[in-house]
Amino acid sequence: MAKNYYEITLALAGICQSAHVVQQLAHTGHCNNDVLHTSLNSVLNLNPSSTLAVYGNDEQNLKVGLETLLGILNTSSNKGAGAELSRYAFSLIALERKLKAKPAALDELGKRIGQLERQLEHFDLLSETIVSALAAIYVDVISTLGPRIQVTGSPEVLKNSQVQAKVRSALLAGIRSAVLWQQIGGGRLQLMFSRGQLVKEAKQILARCPSV
């Protein structure tokens, strides 16, 4: 069956958007709240009607992720900010493979995310309560699967518990996009042999996103 590179590109952009958020938080302690909201909200949509629905049914919501994806696909450097983003993205994809191999962990992940619905009746998605709950899911379910993702940035910034929680919640969102990517036919060979197709799709989607 022919691959749907549009949907595959959207899910990859979701992974890359999470990587971007992690990088911004780790270095500055801040990130764009709209971008973070799109990423965290994707975790909650476990039965989407489409790939785009995971990201709020709006390509514009993935603009940062698409730009980050293009940067990763077009870079050959193994140093600097681009290399850091690549490492986060590929680490998330590797962790998703470990998650897929452990059905009990997948079940626990779904159960814990489902339990958030009650809290969301009382707290905003970006509230400290919900972000901390998402971070706890990442620590309890994902961090136990294998080598932890090494987040690099400002040591002072990374000491902040709220920044730590946002970083972990963003990593959880990256895992969600990696799961989606695999479900719709994504695979690591595409990143080597279908880069041109992915770049083309990402550019076409970005061309439809209005400049802000």
UniProtKB/Swiss-Prot annotation:
Pfam families: DUF489. Keywords: Cell inner membrane, Cell membrane, Cytoplasm, Membrane. InterPro entries: HflD, HflD-like_sf. Coiled coil: none annotated. It is found in: Cytoplasm; Cell inner membrane. GO terms for cellular component: cytoplasm; plasma membrane. The keyword Protein transport does not apply. It is a peripheral membrane protein. Belongs to the HflD family. This is High frequency lysogenization protein HflD homolog. The gene is hflD.
